[in-house]
Amino acid sequence: MAHGPGALMLKCVVVGDGAVGKTCLLMSYANDAFPEEYVPTVFDHYAVSVTVGGKQYLLGLYDTAGQEDYDRLRPLSYPMTDVFLICFSVVNPASFQNVKEEWVPELKEYAPNVPFLLIGTQIDLRDDPKTLARLNDMKEKPICVEQGQKLAKEIGACCYVECSALTQKGLKTVFDEAIIAILTPKKHTVKKRIGSRCINCCLIT
């Protein structure tokens, strides 16, 4: 947690397999709109002004590339991180499996004491006929909420949150919970919810 001009900077880094919607997640939240046209492989760093309990913070949002080609470069963005979001797509079972096999071990190696949340993305595709047909052809099905909650508990995540960058359902909750994970003592993080806290955000350009 670093000091900014008049506000504390909170650093949030998003990790996970490629093509699970990490960049769209960040762009939809930062711009309050789903990117309809070109979506870059990696999202530019944005700072969002966040007010929590009357105090102002700058939430820095950092994207990462999930492909193996970036395995050596990706950890360079990890120092000074306050919270990680480990993302998987609820319609990509392989990305769900890789949370435990790839992403948790990587964070344990490079940032063992930093809190992290488990995020299920692309929930708008859970009932999409074409997506379901594709999964059925592979003898697979979407990841359900209970599976996400169970994995979050197994890996020691602060919580499990599902969202859709397209519809923005659950999107604000993702970042509200990320902020709470940073500002709440570790032993209380899992059970602590938004409660009466007022969290207001605006994009800093």
UniProtKB/Swiss-Prot annotation:
MF terms in GO: GBD domain binding; GTP binding; GTPase activity; profilin binding; protein kinase binding
Annotated motif Effector region, positions: 38-46
Lipidation (S-farnesyl cysteine): 202
Main location: cytoplasm
Entry keywords, A to Z: Cell membrane, Cytoplasm, GTP-binding, Lipoprotein, Membrane, Methylation, Nucleotide-binding, Prenylation
SMART domains listed in its UniProt record: RAB, RAS, RHO
Pfam family, one: Ras
Protein family membership: Belongs to the small GTPase superfamily. Rho family.
Membrane topology of the entry: Lipid-anchor
Regulation: Regulated by guanine nucleotide exchange factors (GEFs) which promote the exchange of bound GDP for free GTP, GTPase activating proteins (GAPs) which increase the GTP hydrolysis activity, and GDP dissociation inhibitors which inhibit the dissociation of the nucleotide from the GTPase.
Record-level GO BP terms: actin filament organization; cellular response to insulin stimulus; cortical actin cytoskeleton organization; endocytosis; establishment of cell polarity; GTP metabolic process; insulin receptor signaling pathway; negative regulation of protein localization to plasma membrane
Protein's UniProt name: Rho-related GTP-binding protein RhoQ
Assembly and interaction partners: Interacts with CDC42EP4 in a GTP-dependent manner. Interacts with ARHGAP33/TCGAP. Interacts with CDC42EP1, CDC42EP2, CDC42EP3, PARD6A, PARD6G (and probably PARD6B) in a GTP-dependent manner. Part of a quaternary complex containing PARD3, some PARD6 protein (PARD6A, PARD6B or PARD6G) and some atypical PKC protein (PRKCI or PRKCZ). Interacts with EXO70 in a GTP-dependent manner. Interacts with GOPC.
Species annotation: Homo sapiens
Residue numbers bearing the Cysteine methyl ester modification: 202
PTM comment: May be post-translationally modified by both palmitoylation and polyisoprenylation.
GO cellular component: actin filament; extracellular exosome; Golgi-associated vesicle membrane; membrane raft; plasma membrane
Alphabetized PANTHER family for the sequence: RHO FAMILY GTPASE (PTHR24072)
Cell location: Cytoplasm; Cell membrane
Residues the entry annotates as binding GTP: 16-23, 63-67, 121-124
